[in-house]
Amino acid sequence: MQPAVLLGFLGATVVAAVSSMPVDNRNHNEEMVAHCIIEVLSNALSKSNAPPITPECRQVLKKGGKEVKDEEKGANENTRFEVRLLRDPADTSETQRPSGGREGAEAPSEDTQGPPGADVEGGGHSREGAGKPRGGPYSSDNPVAKEGKTRHSEKSEGQDREEEEGEKYQKRERGEEGSEERHLQEPGETQTAFLNQGNRATAKKKEEFESRYDAHSAGGPAKTHSRERSSQESGEETGSQDAAPGEPESPPEGQEAPEESQEDASLEVDKRRWRPRHHHGRSRPDRAPQEGSPPPEERGHPREESEESVLGLASPGGQRTRHPTHYPASEEEAEHGEEVRSSSSVQAPGDLVGARYGGRGGAEHRAARRPGEESPEQDRRVGASSELRNKGPGHSEESEEERGDEGQRHHRAWAGGPRADAPPDPAEEEQFWGEAHRPVPESQVDEARRHPQAKLRNYLNRGEENGEEGAPGRWQQPEDLQGPGEHAAEARLPGKPYAAHRIPEKKRLGELLNPYYVPPQWESSHFERKDNVGDNFLEGEDANGVTLNEKTFFPEYSYDWWEKKPFEEDVNWGYEERNLAPKLDLKRQYDRVAELDQLLHYRKKSAEFPDFYDSGEHLSPRHAAESEKERAGQGVLTEEEEKELENLAAMDLELQKIAEKFSGNRRG
């Protein structure tokens, strides 16, 4: 056991010496790494004569992977600091002048909160960002030297930790040697990947980064339109520089961490390069005091600079709302809410009007305008803009309340006479809210959508109103294509007499336009009136109001028509209507005669053969006696009665012939 411990100590000291030696032992270290790689590969390929893997090789392989990670991390940090040092001299002359007021305004919030940007982006590992002064880009200590010191201390701590791990590893080594030899292919492959690709990737990304920055810095001055845009760019870059140094301090969690940090840096440059910058020449004056202009007690600038800050020309604080990537902006806005309210109420009305009409005669408008002279159109515009501001997405409730109070104070400053910070008059406040909620005038499209027929009628009757009666070529009947309800609505208008010729015109149009239009044969005048219900409204119209004519809706019911209607569905309607009435009359007469003939024939037969036509009922003796008496009383038929019966029989035969004749014609 003691030789193993001594061997572990020896290996750890050798590894520490090799890693701590500078450039002189580099070749020896590379030879050791190559020898260890050969051993690992031969064991992985399970060669028979492969030498066993020594613990020194294991320590070298383990240390080599960490060295590659440290090298990539150091290269990444060096590229960041080099780019920053290259960028700082070009921007210092522009950032120092406009950022003075902003630093003074944000000093209290930064003292209370600490550096929020570095904490958020660095994920809590912001030792360098917290200890570094935020004033200018150049600090008293050299950041490269400080970074080198921190890296050296981290490396020494890592070596001590590795020595302890080496001792424990030597103790466990003998029991786990067989299982570990199978899995040693992965460290060998990662070592080769790091040696072959790591340095090339870092060098290549560094070159791309520097060339991209050179192209950006060369094309930047040509793209800037004015001093205002360059100041905006400098303000953005200083904000990103404050947040950037906190990122390299966080230790990498995996092997992709250095590459991800390099990609983040390149993405930041691309975002700064291609980010759209809106509102170059102007900004909204009612939002400018809230966005970034410091209060009057903190800014020591003359009146011209205050006007520029209202217009949004040189205040870098206005970039908070434009670039939502700076997260601490909403917190700072919430802290400065009271200062914003005080500064917005003190603002003079002339400055605001001049800012609104800055590019087109602002001074003349300010001179010509007097307090209390604002037109209703401007009031409406102010109310609509304040409502839109309050409804805008992406803002906190505090900022919306600030904007609402600010809009009220602006309104009082414009319309309220000499004292702009006076307490609000209730009459003025009522007038302001009435103007803000005044209904917007209806556009022509909405009006035409709601009143299309009235618009058409006005257009068609324009000539009659001007005195032209019956202009040639005009469409005289546009209402014929409208519904009956529109007729009624039109007739209730004064000066519109009822035209009686519209009914046939409408019918003719219906017959022409509808290919399936078949007028029914039983249509009467009542049904014609029913088709034009709206016209009947007009016929029954009195001075007191509209009275309905019940004939319009309830025509006279014809019972005969339902009796005449045939039961067969496939008959020809026109032929049946012409010939049905005489046949029915004849059939009724025939039925009556047939009934009479049948009765007489029955009486005659019953008289001749009384026993045959007997009902067959079993009569009681009393009833039988009565029937016999009746027969005796009746006696035999007289000659006159017999003649009548013969005549009736002849008539019956004739009627039967006539009926057969009619039925034959009907079948044929």
UniProtKB/Swiss-Prot annotation:
**UniProt KW Transmembrane helix keyword:** no
Secretion signal, residue range per the UniProt entry: 1-20
Disulfide feature:
36-57
List GO terms (cellular component aspect).
extracellular space; secretory granule
Q: Where is this protein chiefly located?
A: secreted
Which positions bear Sulfotyrosine? 557, 613
The Phosphoserine modification is found at 93, 99, 126, 179, 217, 306, 330, 375, 396, 399, 524-525, 606, 615, 620
Q: Which InterPro entries match?
A: Chromogranin_AB, Chromogranin_CS, Granin
UniProt KW Glycoprotein keyword: yes
> PTM comment for this protein?
Peptide SR-17 exists in both monophosphorylated and diphosphorylated forms.
| Compositional bias ranges of the Polar residues kind | 188-200
Q: Where is the composition biased (Basic and acidic residues)?
A: 64-90, 122-131, 144-159, 167-186, 204-215, 362-397, 435-450, 615-632
Phosphothreonine modified-residue sites: 79, 92
Specify where the region named Disordered lies, as residue ranges. Answer: 64-498, 611-643
Glycan attachment positions: 93, 234
Q: Origin, by domain of life?
A: Eukaryota
Q: Which residue ranges have biased composition labelled Basic residues?
A: 272-282
Where is the protein localized?
A: Secreted
- What's a BP term from Gene Ontology annotated to this protein? exocytosis
Where are the compositionally biased (Low complexity) regions?
237-255
Subunit comment for this entry? Answer: Interacts with ITPR1 in the secretory granules.
Role description: Secretogranin-1 is a neuroendocrine secretory granule protein, which may be the precursor for other biologically active peptides.
Family from the record: Belongs to the chromogranin/secretogranin protein family.
- Identification of the protein by name: Secretogranin-1
Source species of the chain: Sus scrofa (Pig)
